[in-house]
Design a protein with these regions (language model features):
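Hydrophobic positions on the alpha1 helix immediately C-terminal to the Walker A/P-loop
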Residues: 20
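A glycine- and Lys/Arg-enriched "phosphate-lid" helix/loop adjacent to the NTP-binding pocket
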Residues: 98-143
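Post-Walker A helix-loop "phosphate-sensing" segment adjacent to the P-loop in P-loop NTPases
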Residues: 26-37, 45
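Conserved lysine of the Walker
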Residues: 17
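ATP-dependent small-molecule kinase phosphotransfer cores
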Residues: 37-96, 121, 138
Length: 171
């Protein structure tokens, strides 16, 4: 067996999916795609504007379409998804059927610290009040966890763990 053609990184906003994805793609000599960046490129809008002007339902449909397009690409790739992508439509099943899914299970304290710095670029987080951010993020995590747990592998964002998992998938 060889390394899966597509490797999908899933997890909460601020978990480090994009950072780890870039590192992993470089190590494996593959293209890297950030699902949110691809959505923005194709829509011609930034995600906060899509949420604000058109709504989350439209965004989720667009997200599903772009994810499906990336799955169908005829090239090996590492794909960092948006935090909610695995939780809508049959996205997680699609990803599991197309390659390896890796849940980046970063400690909540680290996630909160990161999203506070980038709150305005994260529509769901931006709606949360600062004094209840930790509680709201914890609730969001609990809601999404059953979807994330369908991943092939879970790590706390350690590149070496991911590489070892992929190496073991080869044998």
């Amino acid at each position: 067996m060889k390394t899966p053609s597509k490797i999908f990184l899933v997890g909460m906003p601020g978990s480090g999916k994009s950072t780890l994805g870039k590192q992993l793609a470089e190590k494996l000599n593959r293209n890297f795609f950030d699902l949110d960046a691809e959505i923005e490129r194709m829509a011609g809008w930034v995600i906060p504007d899509i949420f604000e002007q058109i709504g989350e339902d439209y965004f989720r449909e667009l997200e599903n379409s772009v994810l499906t397009m990336l799955i169908k690409l005829n090239e090996p790739a590492v794909i960092a998804t948006g935090g909610g992508a695995p939780c809508f439509f049959d996205n997680m099943d699609q990803m599991n059927g197309a390659g390896a899914t890796i849940f980046i299970n970063t400690p909540m304290d680290t996630i909160i610290e990161r999203v506070k710095k980038e709150k305005s670029t994260r529509p769901l987080v931006n709606r949360m009040e600062d004094d209840s951010l930790a509680q709201d993020m914890e609730a969001l995590y609990k809601k999404r966890l059953p979807h994330y747990e369908k991943a092939s592998f879970t790590t706390n964002s350690n590149l070496q763990d991911v590489v070892q998992f992929l190496e073991s998938a080869k044998s």
